């Protein structure tokens, strides 16, 4: 008769042990907060995908320091350069429809001559622009195409590097603003409206480029650390209403920042990420073809010198980023993109091999020498929530 009593005690012990053992949600939340403390972060929103679903979504800290309003999962942030992938995704829709080709000369698409004056005989293609191999140099003001327009700046020599288009890599915000303008010109729909209708809303998400079409109450304010104090970066959510009367269709698209202007929550960005993880479709809704999804994720440029990236079409491979050797060998690199502007840092990263994905964004932090807050957040979340 002792055996039933023994098993009862064993069962009770197991229940008590499991009750005391932190859940993966608790471990993940603690890991994120530890990173926040190290970087004195204003706020962090994060979402984790495993096995085709969001298994974790939490927000910490503040959306507004002045009012001490806490950050929630419904709040949106300007995600900076992850936005480039939204522009590329939209253009790949037109490629799928046969309207344009990645090998098209962008001069034919935009309506004026785009040529590197050092190599005027070489056409600059859409594929080059989306992979940062077009030899286009960022100017201080890349929110206008004037610096690429011969009618304004002649041969525009200062807007180009000396290497041949397609034979070098330099990250170019100007190039992606050109790509967004091409989307507008070719589709016949204003840039921000096209992306919102055909990508964001089609996936059932909330967000977009145009400040004036979104609820300002959901914006998580973005801060930069200046001399030890956090200062709001008001330019991050600047209204474009004053620019609209002079808006030139097919030319003024850069004011919406195709290169970095999407505002979205971590939760909804994770759903967008799952669409790319699933080869261009999510929940029965196809956004781009499997062929186009693969093209975006396949490096056009492979690292040849320090500072370069393994870059596809507005998506990149992460090398020596996740602290697990299995993801640091060719064929196993995670894919995604990062963003950084106005004090915000953001990341969207996933493993095609193992089906996990992480989204994290912070609306302000203090730099720590020799460390990256995005790498720290990614690895903290990976260790707590994903690694077995």
Go through each PLM region and give its residues.
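Short, surface-exposed loop or secondary-structure junction motifs
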Residues: 117-335
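Short, conserved catalytic-motif segment at the N-terminal edge
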Residues: 24-77, 150-159
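Short, gly/Ser/Thr-rich active-site loops of penicillin-recognizing serine hydrolases
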Residues: 304-309, 320, 360-388
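Bacterial N-terminal signal peptides that target proteins for export
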Residues: 1-7
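Short, well-ordered beta-strand elements
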Residues: 337, 345-364
């Amino acid at each position: 008769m002792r055996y039933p009593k023994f098993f009862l005690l064993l069962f009770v012990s197991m229940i008590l042990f499991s009750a005391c053992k932190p859940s993966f949600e608790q471990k993940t939340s603690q890991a994120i907060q530890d990173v926040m403390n190290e970087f004195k972060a204003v706020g962090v929103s994060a979402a984790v995908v495993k096995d085709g679903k969001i298994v974790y979504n939490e927000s910490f800290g503040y959306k507004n320091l002045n009012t001490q309003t806490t950050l929630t999962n419904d709040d949106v942030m300007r995600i900076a350069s992850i936005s480039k992938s939204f522009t590329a995704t939209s253009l790949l829709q037109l490629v799928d429809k046969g309207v344009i080709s990645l090998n098209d000369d962008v001069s034919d698409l935009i309506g004026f001559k785009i040529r590197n004056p050092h190599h005027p005989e070489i056409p600059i293609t859409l594929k080059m622009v989306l992979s940062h191999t077009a030899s286009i140099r960022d100017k201080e003001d890349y929110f206008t195409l004037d610096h690429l327009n011969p009618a304004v700046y002649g041969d525009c020599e200062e807007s180009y590097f000396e290497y041949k288009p397609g034979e070098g890599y330099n990250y170019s915000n100007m190039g992606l603003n050109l790509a967004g303008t091409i989307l507008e010109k070719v589709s016949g729909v204003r840039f921000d409206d096209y992306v919102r209708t055909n990508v964001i809303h089609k996936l059932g998400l909330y967000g977009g480029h145009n400040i004036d079409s979104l609820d300002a109450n959901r914006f998580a304010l973005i801060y930069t650390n200046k001399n030890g104090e956090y200062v709001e970066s008001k330019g991050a959510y600047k209204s474009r209403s004053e620019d609209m009367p002079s808006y030139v269709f097919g030319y003024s698209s850069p004011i919406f920042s195709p290169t970095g202007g999407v505002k979205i929550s971590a939760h909804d960005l994770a759903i967008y990420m799952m669409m790319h993880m699933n080869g261009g479709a999510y929940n029965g809704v196809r956004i781009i073809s499997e062929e186009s999804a693969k093209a975006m994720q396949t490096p056009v440029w492979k690292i040849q010198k320090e500072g370069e990236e393994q870059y596809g079409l507005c998506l990149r491979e992460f090398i020596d980023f996740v602290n697990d050797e299995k993801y640091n060998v060719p064929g196993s690199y995670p894919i995604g993109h990062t963003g950084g502007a106005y004090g915000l840092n953001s990341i969207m990263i996933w493993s095609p091999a193992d089906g996990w994905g992480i989204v994290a964004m912070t609306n302000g932090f203090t730099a720590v020498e020799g460390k990256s807050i995005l790498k720290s957040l990614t690895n903290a979340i990976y260790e707590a929530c994903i690694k077995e």
